[in-house]
């Protein structure tokens, strides 16, 4: 590989090569070796109550610590969505018993490596590449959790073995998974090293009772200790056997939901060395390629002289693609992908682009300023501890002119209810959003100073605005 041809991955020779010249998207699958060698194709959320060990489990499986920000480390909680990728391997020697034949490693590990288990031979071969979306467990951070749920294919529900089940956020998260129609759930009974066997069995019964009648009914319950890495290979085995590989669309025009964005330039950087903004997100469909022209909607939002909203989509070009530390020439749905662009870095600074949609020019959905939704409210507030035998507070009906928080894809924005009739509602959004009819949205209301999930809806139609495009 001398001289480096365009369109071929140069870095990481131990991973499968990606070559744009020979790329045929119709032949790709979520298990194609050249894809899973470099990026994850399944998104798994970790959900559960605060301090039940979600981030620790992700660290045990992937080796990546998802708590990255200073204020998160000090308080030992996850605030922003954390991400980590892990490769799961299976030993090709059939004499090795389960679950020892499964193993997880970080995302830049080679695609196969020889067995180090005494008495076995053969190689560990890559079978899955998963991305963990580590969601915050605090009720105040519920919006972040819902933004994560938009990109999940499956979920690990964590329950700490040394506390009674269910804890408040556990039920709220379970409701969020129901909204997002996540069918594949593994329940992990964590911190098993801290309790006696009888206690663990008793809690097992509590968990069974708690999930009865929910989407998690019948989900496997695996006792683990994330801190001691006990039973982690069983979790790997279940991820491979119980979570089906989602069907992906590789042939449509690509579309990515932006979940975070950054300016990667250091202060004092020379002008010639400035790099464009980086958007991180999950591709919903299609394949993004290096060198491709892209559009970001709604783009730059402003008001004209008469106070009318204007949206100016951002047009740019992809200069690099990466998944954690792996370079990509093309990126497929699943996993968190970093997209290096030529966009002005100040527009991407500190997550400013979150909630925008990035994709092929001219192929993105409409920009809505008002939505008409058919909605469904929860009967009672979730996750609020109540005194004694009193049931949780009832959810009041939507009232005209009240302000709700609306979650659409990865965007959280305010919305004023302008009309309500039976199960239909009209909402005027504070920020315009790029979305389509049929998308699901989550509704939260401010209750005692916290945003609480009160229900969800589906977009039936809405008021759209035409994007303003400069005639250059």
Curated annotation (Swiss-Prot):
Residues covered by region (G5): 225-227
Biological processes per GO annotation: positive regulation of male gonad development; spermatogenesis
Domain of life: Eukaryota
Tissues where the protein occurs: Widely expressed. In the adult brain, high levels in hippocampus, habenula, hypothalamic nuclei and cerebellum. Also expressed in embryonic brain.
GO MF annotation: an example: translation initiation factor activity
Disruption phenotype annotation: Knockout males are infertile. Their testes are smaller as compared to wild-type fertile males and exhibit spermatogonial proliferation block.
Positions of region (G1): 48-55
Domain tr-type G: 39-247
Phosphoserine: residues carrying this PTM: 16
Gene3D superfamilies (alphabetical): P-loop containing nucleotide triphosphate hydrolases (3.40.50.300), Translation factors (2.40.30.10)
Major enzyme class: hydrolase
Catalytic activity: GTP + H2O = GDP + phosphate + H(+)
Assembly mode: eIF2 is a heterotrimer composed of an alpha (EIF2S1), a beta (EIF2S2) and a gamma (Eif2s3x and Eif2s3y) chain. eIF2 is member of the 43S pre-initiation complex (43S PIC).
Protein name in the entry: Eukaryotic translation initiation factor 2 subunit 3, Y-linked
Species name: Mus musculus
